[in-house]
Amino acid sequence: MFDGIGFMELLLIGVLGLVVLGPERLPVAVRSITSWIRAMKRMANSVKEELEQELKIEQLHADLKKAESKGLSNLSPELKESIEQLKQAAQSVNRPYQVQDPVKDTPAPENQIYSPVASTVQTSPAQASQANPTATVEASPAPASPATPSEPSQGADTRSNPKANG
């Protein structure tokens, strides 16, 4: 990385940094600079790996087109291998995105009887809870919350409550 910089130049940069930043801030500055350099190296390596992967895919596509133009009968072993790799890559890409429909997988009952929706029939709460367990929750009214003793209700007499008088 420092191909053109010798020891004397690095020593000069260190002394200038010590004079400009001081002994308290110099170690912090060196640590932050090295972390930035590491982050840039990681980013450059990831970009390089992605480009290599894309180039490999492009090479596989070129080999496949070459194989198609020659015909699939007289192929070299390299081309056969690259075709197999391309097929495996295509299968691995398509496999995670396949969604299995549970409705299609399970057979539908042929003689299923659907219950009609009856909104006009009056039932007792016991019958409703047997027919639909969620109906009792929906039909029961919410309990009224009583006012807490620390919070007087509107218009309540607060003379006997010392907390309410403040």
From Swiss-Prot:
List membrane-spanning regions: 2-22
Q: Which keywords fit this entry according to its UniProt record?
A: Cell inner membrane, Cell membrane, Membrane, Protein transport, Translocation, Transmembrane, Transmembrane helix, Transport
Q: Where is the protein localized?
A: Cell inner membrane
Q: Does the keyword Cell membrane apply?
A: yes
According to its UniProt record, what is one Pfam family this protein matches?
TatA_B_E
Q: Which Gene Ontology molecular-function terms are recorded?
A: protein transmembrane transporter activity
Q: Where is this region: Disordered?
A: 69-166
For the biological process aspect of GO, one term held by this record is:
protein transport by the Tat complex
The biased composition feature labelled Polar residues covers 88-97, 112-132, 155-166
Q: Does the keyword Protein transport apply?
A: yes
* Biased composition, class Low complexity, residue ranges: 133-153
- State the membrane topology: Single-pass membrane protein
For this record, an example GO cellular component is: TAT protein transport complex
Stored InterPro entries: TatA/B/E, TatB
Tell me the function of this protein.
Part of the twin-arginine translocation (Tat) system that transports large folded proteins containing a characteristic twin-arginine motif in their signal peptide across membranes. Together with TatC, TatB is part of a receptor directly interacting with Tat signal peptides. TatB may form an oligomeric binding site that transiently accommodates folded Tat precursor proteins before their translocation.
Which family does the entry's similarity section mention? Belongs to the TatB family.
Q: Whom does it interact with, and what assembly results?
A: The Tat system comprises two distinct complexes: a TatABC complex, containing multiple copies of TatA, TatB and TatC subunits, and a separate TatA complex, containing only TatA subunits. Substrates initially bind to the TatABC complex, which probably triggers association of the separate TatA complex to form the active translocon.
Its name, as the record gives it, is Sec-independent protein translocase protein TatB
Task: Tell me the lineage of the source organism.
Answer: Bacteria, Pseudomonadati, Pseudomonadota, Gammaproteobacteria, Alteromonadales
